[in-house]
């Protein structure tokens, strides 16, 4: 489920939201509305798993689609549309993550403190079905929190690769293309990240 708060970019442009995208629409036959509907959950999910905060992920997702809107003419079809969008999303989310880390190093608020002081901003509540029992809902929330905690233990590059492979289900080739790194680098990052997660799961 994708949050309702994310909306299409509002920019002054000769291209309306229903118009075919220059450079993208001409190749794949999608309007911007259709592209947004197809990829918004993917972009938000990636940003959320990297950042761990609903509002931050919403902000990043807005930035991503605004960037797509502005850069639509640069898409040449040399990669798949999905990996092109992933590349933009990873870059934006990673930049936001590094920004939080810089604040932490300066002695200002950390992302972890921000989350703990704003629990109502967690996405977990949006994924909890009203049909669930309170016990099941609590268990699912605890499981999500544990996954998020373990992912937060990974270095950023490993975290991104593991998320793209094990959560989003991308192939190694798609990840390599999205991150603009070699296939061997992708496999190494995922293997190392999984090893760290395995140690955490085993309580080591």
Give each language-model segment a name.
Residues 1-42, 49, 128, 135-136, ...:
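N-terminal module of bacterial RNA polymerase sigma factors
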Residues 25-26, 65-80, 99-101:
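Sigma70-family region 2
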Residues 38-41, 49-52, 163-173:
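Short helix-capping/turn signature of helix-turn-helix
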Residues 45, 59-66, 79-91:
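Structural recognition of an alpha-helix C-terminal capping motif at a helix-to-coil junction
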Residues 74-76, 90-119:
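Arg/Lys-rich amphipathic alpha helix in sigma70-family domain 2
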Residues 77, 97-101, 154, 159, ...:
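Short, Lys/Arg-enriched C-terminal cap helix and immediately downstream tail that follows
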Residues 116-149:
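Acidic, proline/glycine-rich intrinsically disordered inter-domain spacer in sigma factors
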Residues 145-185:
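Helix-turn-helix DNA-binding module
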